[in-house]
Amino acid sequence: MAKPKIKFVPDSLHVKTGDIVYVISGKDKKMTGKVLKVFPKKGKIIVEGINIVTKHLKPSQVNPQGGVVQKEAAIFSSKVMLFDEKTKSPTRVGYEVRDGKKVRISKKSGEII
């Protein structure tokens, strides 16, 4: 029998809820969107307007009509980079201690995120 694959899950994510991110791979490559939700244990995020999937809903008490709904699905956080508003391009995230607090900075512009 083959060994089971070990899934890699990062200790922490480089993006937070509310960040503007740039998709670097996949079907939505070169698109930007706002992070709506973060799943750190799975290493995934949900981005507004990215990875839209069609979901078929059965009729229920909440939704008696049922039907077809389009919504955002989660993508791996490694597929996105933080989008720098100042340089209008994707950037890596760095960390610095300023005034006794650890802050995230943009590697391209040096600005605090």
Curated annotation (Swiss-Prot):
PROSITE patterns documented for this protein: RIBOSOMAL_L24
PANTHER family tied to this protein: MITOCHONDRIAL RIBOSOMAL PROTEIN L24
The species this protein was found in: Fusobacterium nucleatum subsp. nucleatum (strain ATCC 25586 / DSM 15643 / BCRC 10681 / CIP 101130 / JCM 8532 / KCTC 2640 / LMG 13131 / VPI 4355)
Signal peptide span: none
Single GO molecular function: structural constituent of ribosome
SUPFAM superfamilies reported in the protein's UniProt record: Translation proteins SH3-like domain (SSF50104)
Biological processes, Gene Ontology terms: translation
Family: Belongs to the universal ribosomal protein uL24 family.
Keyword 4Fe-4S (UniProt): no
One Pfam family in the UniProt entry: ribosomal_L24
Subunit structure: Part of the 50S ribosomal subunit.
Functional note: One of two assembly initiator proteins, it binds directly to the 5'-end of the 23S rRNA, where it nucleates assembly of the 50S subunit. One of the proteins that surrounds the polypeptide exit tunnel on the outside of the subunit.
UniProt keyword terms in alphabetical order: Ribonucleoprotein, Ribosomal protein, RNA-binding, rRNA-binding
Protein name as it appears in the record: Large ribosomal subunit protein uL24
CDD domains documented for this protein: KOW_RPL26
Entry keyword annotation includes Zinc-finger: no
GO cellular component: cytosolic large ribosomal subunit
HAMAP family, alphabetized: Ribosomal_uL24_B
Gene3D superfamilies listed in its UniProt record: 2.30.30.30
